[in-house]
UniProtKB/Swiss-Prot annotation:
It comes from Mycolicibacterium gilvum (strain PYR-GCK). This is UPF0102 protein Mflv_4140. SUPFAM superfamilies: Restriction endonuclease-like. Gene3D superfamilies: 3.40.1350.10. Disulfide bonds: none annotated. HAMAP family: UPF0102. NCBIfam families: PRK12497.1-3, PRK12497.3-1, PRK12497.3-3, YraN family protein. InterPro entries: Restrct_endonuc-II-like (IPR011335), tRNA_endonuc-like_dom_sf (IPR011856), UPF0102_YraN-like (IPR003509). It holds the Pfam family UPF0102.
Length: 123
């Protein structure tokens, strides 16, 4: 198994843990790994309680070597997510009262339970 395969596996595990967590909050998954020429949206969910669509960036970490939660999503990344969200919305027939960008960070490592942090409204 290559380092790339390992990273992809860790990322996929983190994303699944994030989706399970979001569904546990009562959010409904609309899309996963939506791609276009400008990038990818990790997870798109509906918060039916407030008629909102939420675009969720999932960051999975095995160490803090590349920064923690605060460094997970930069202003440049937020701008890119906004653009992608707009493109995704333009393809939808449904309309929502509000739109939100969230981040879920997942820390996983050997011998410990995964730790999830959910930051709502990052941009």
């Amino acid at each position: 198994m290559t380092r790339t395969d390992t990273r992809a596996g860790v990322g996929a595990l983190g994303e699944q843990l994030a989706v399970d967590y979001l569904q546990g909050l009562g959010l409904r998954v609309l899309a996963r790994n939506w791609r276009c020429r400008y990038g990818e949206l990790d997870v798109v969910v509906a918060d039916d309680a407030v008629q909102a669509v939420v675009f969720v960036e999932v960051k999975t970490r095995t160490t803090d070597r590349f920064g923690g939660v605060a460094e997970a999503v930069t202003p440049v990344k937020v701008r890119r997510l906004r653009r992608l969200a707009g493109l995704w919305l333009s393809e939808q027939d449904a309309r929502w009262e509000s739109v939100r960008l969230d981040v879920v960070t997942v820390r996983i490592g050997q011998g410990r339970s995964p730790e999830l942090t959910h930051i709502e409204g990052v941009g």
